Structures are given as C-alpha cells and as structure tokens.
Regions:
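An alpha-beta-alpha
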Residues: 49, 67, 156-203, 305-321
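Beta-alpha junction/loop-to-helix N-cap segments that form part of ligand/metal-binding clefts
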Residues: 89-146, 237-259, 264
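Hinge/cleft segment of the Venus flytrap/periplasmic-binding protein
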Residues: 294-346
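Hydrophobic alpha-helical segments within soluble ligand-binding/sensing domains
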Residues: 139-152, 156-178, 279-299
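Extracytoplasmic "Venus flytrap"
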Residues: 46-68, 74, 85-94, 188-190, ...
C-alpha cells in the first residue's frame, strides 16, 4: 500500500503540474490573441487625413489650426484616433498636384484642401476618396459641387463667400469720397476673378470706376500696388491667395500714400488693410472640423450640404485708420472688432 502511494502521488502531482502549465500556456495564447485583436482594432481606428494648403498666409493658417483644434475638441487628436499629414504647395501648382497625387496613392481616408486652388487640384485627382474643402469662395461656380444643398460625388465643404456690396457699403461709410477704386488679383485664381466681377457690378451701379491690376505671383504685388496709389481713391483686395501672401507689402505702399485698402478677410485687416465686413476664419475651421467628424463616422460627403458662413463681423485696423487719418464713426465702432498690426482688440 505504501509502495502504491509512493507511485500514485508523484503521478498525480506531475499530472496536476502539466495541467497547470497547459492552462497557463492556453491563457497566455488567449491573451496574445486578445492583444492582437486589440492592436488590430486600434489600427483600424486610425483615420488618415491629408491637409493641403496652396500657400502660407494667415487666413489659411488660421483655418488649418482651427480645423485641427476643432477635431481635437471632438475627441479626434492627431496621433491617436487620427493621423494628419499637412503639406504646403508654397504657391506652386506643380507641387499642389504632386501633393494631391501622393494623398491619393497613399489611400488616405480624407483629403482636406484649403482654398479653391487646392480643392480643384484634389478634385482632379480622385472621385473616390472623400474631399472636404474649406475657404472656397464659389464652389458651385467653380464646378466643385453639383448643388450646395446636395453636393453629390465625393465632395463637400465650407465656403468663405464674401458679400462685396456689404464691404463696399462699409467702405463708403468710412471713406465716402471714393470715385475710383483699384484692385489687385491673380486672374488665374477663379475665386479672385469671381469676386472682382462682383466688384465691377457694384461699381457700375454706384457710378464708380475700377482700375484692375492682375498679377501671376506674389513678387509682382508691390509694383502693382505702387502703380495704383496715384490713380485711385481706395484699393480693394478680393479673396486671392497670391495677393494675401504679400498683403503686408500692399499695406505699406498704401499707408504711405494715405490710400485705404478694403479687403475680403479678417487676417488681411490684421496685416494692415483698413477694414472688411466678413467671416471669422477660426469659426470656418471649426465648422469644417464638425463636418469632418460626420465623414469619419461614415457619412457620405455628397450628402452633406456645403456650409456658407452667415455670421459676419466688421473688422477694422485701428493702427491703419490712425496712420491714414480715417475717423471711425461711433455706430460702426460699436459693432467692430479692432486690430492693431499685431493683435485684435474687442
């Protein structure tokens, strides 16, 4: 009996140990499987977004930063649930096309082109990857969408359409003696050409004349501004990425000549333009981020209406007004957001 116990007991212990080891091994494999599944799930959650910007300037930078911050505020932080690849074409159309082609070949989940030239380039490269444009002045007229309420295809976005009449009405309140107005723009930018056409309509209705100066790159802006200041009572800058990138030059030339410059974006007021009546580009970026989350969650871009900002503000550069001797009527001052050349004041 003792002999039997001596044989059976070790066998039982060995069997138990084997089962325990087997159980641990199985549990480890299960944990590895679970870890693998979790890792795979995490990978699936990373949504790749390519942001492309035609050129570096404050308006577009403001939109981009607000867009990224807006995504983060909704729980989509770069490097966590999403991965953002930001590229700047530095004003070069060839670079712009190459960037968009790279986004497409990399099979990004969403392309976010900032401004009309970027949107046109992206739309020309893919009909499948969702495109969410922002700061496109005339998306319908430029053929980006079929309908503002139901864009169709793989594209939608936000528009920074300006009301030229409201800007010019403000201009005539601040500087009522305008008879001739000059404008500088890149005729290759359809957004700028569209706004200038609206300016021409307004001027004709008001009995004003318009002097146009077209440029092809930012290095030509200074000469264009210098050629205008002796011929006009004011200058109007449309939504134009080429001119915007050289806005401080326009402001310097015009301020020295005591010529008011009316612009189409708040950032151009910050860069020395006298005034505008327009949208808040931070809000534009934030609204674009909200639409991006809809797309991330599976909504078809073509079913999301294009959003045009309706909440407009008066923006005035206090430093510029003082420099050129323009007094701001109190009723306008009460509604305005003021800029110095450095920062806005409420």
């Amino acid at each position: 009996m003792k002999v039997l116990r001596r044989i059976v007991l070790p066998l039982l212990l060995i069997t138990a140990a084997a089962m325990l080891l087997g159980g641990c091994s199985g549990d480890g494999d299960a944990k590895k499987d679970d870890a693998g599944k979790t890792s795979e799930a995490n990978k699936e959650k990373v949504f790749t977004i390519g942001i492309v910007q035609i050129v570096e300037h404050p308006s577009l930078n403001e939109i981009r930063e607000a867009f990224i911050n807006g995504l983060a505020a909704q729980g989509y932080v770069d490097g966590e649930k999403i991965k953002i690849d930001y590229q700047n074409a530095q004003g070069d159309q060839v670079n712009l096309k190459t960037i968009c082609q790279k986004f497409v070949s990399s099979k990004y989940d969403l392309i976010v082109p900032i401004a009309t030239p970027s949107a046109q380039a992206a739309a020309g490269e893919t009909k499948e990857i969702p495109i969410l444009f922002t700061a496109c002045t005339n998306p319908l007229g430029d053929g980006l969408v079929n309908d503002l309420q139901k864009p169709g295809k793989n594209i939608t976005g936000t528009s920074d359409a300006v009301d030229v009449a409201q800007i010019m009405d403000l201009a005539l309140k601040l500087t009522p003696d305008i008879k001739t107005i000059g404008t500088i723009y890149n005729s290759g930018e359809t957004n700028a050409s569209y706004v200038v056409k609206e300016l021409l309509k307004y001027a004709e209705a008001q009995g004003m004349s318009v002097v146009e100066k077209t440029i092809t790159n930012s290095s030509e802006v200074q000469q264009a501004a210098m050629s205008l200041v002796d011929k006009v009572d004011a200058i109007f800058i449309p939504i134009d990425n080429t001119v915007a990138s050289a806005m401080p030059v326009v402001s310097q030339v015009a301020n020295q000549a005591k010529i008011p410059v009316y612009v189409s974006a708040d950032s151009l007021v910050a860069d020395g333009g006298l005034a505008t009546y327009g949208i808040d580009y931070t809000v534009l970026g934030e609204e674009t981020a909200k639409m991006a989350v809809e797309i991330i969650n599976g909504k078809n871009p073509g079913d999301i209406p294009v959003k045009t900002m309706k909440d407009l503000k008066i923006y005035i550069n206090k430093t510029t007004a003082e420099t050129i001797g323009v007094e701001i009527p109190q009723d306008i001052a009460d509604q305005a957001e003021f800029f110095s050349l450095a920062a806005p004041e409420k």
